[in-house]
Amino acid sequence: MDNKKFLDFLKQNRIEPKNLSIYLEALTHKSYANEHKLTKNYQRLEFLGDACVEWVISNFIFNYKIKDNEKMRSLDEGEMTRARSNMVRSEILSYAAKDLGLTDFLMIGVGLEQDQSARMEKIYEDIFEAFIGAVAQDQGIKKVSLILEKTLIKYFREGQINYQKDYKTIFQEQAQRINKKPIMYKLVRNEGDKKEVHLVWNDLIYGIGIASTRKEAEILAAKNAILKLDDYTKKA
């Protein structure tokens, strides 16, 4: 790792490290640790970061207000649960790691360097949580909140994540009001970081999703399918 670039990265995120080694630990995969005979990897910090993310996001959601019938109100328990679940999904945390630029500093074993499978997406999720754990240990929970404001909370405010039911559930409920035919998510392309999924219902392709993970592609396919289903019901 280029320590100067990493220090610049921390500075861009308003972090003046008291203990640089804890951040390096947060970015060290066990394969790299094994190859270089290091005693530490990111797993313990990932455990801590997971708890920190949950607390900060739960606190944000608890205080979040929405406009409902011209009045502002808090989210109810079900909405809070869905919002938190949507905000900490694996693909969201993985995306946040890439968006923040953490993946540029990941230290990983030689055997995994060329791996473009879903396993890497899981590793990106892990280092995001581990980095949050490192920030919590070195800087405190307020700085963690600032990092999450730039990522997960920003995605929520911009509408990329919502507190309502996920797209797959919405499509399933709407489709089953019409008939009970099965909904299938077919993986039709699996090329490195490009997964293409077709949502098939009523013997028709209702939605297509392309993303870096199959799960995310299924969600996009369901989102597109909802629009097509709306047209179907309007014409019916």
Curated annotation (Swiss-Prot):
It catalyses: Endonucleolytic cleavage to 5'-phosphomonoester. One of its GO terms (molecular function) is ribonuclease III activity. It is found in: Cytoplasm. It comes from the Bacteria. The keyword Signal does not apply. The active site is at D50, E129. Mg(2+) binds at E46, D126, E129. GO terms for biological process: mRNA processing; regulation of gene expression; rRNA processing; tRNA processing. This is Ribonuclease 3.
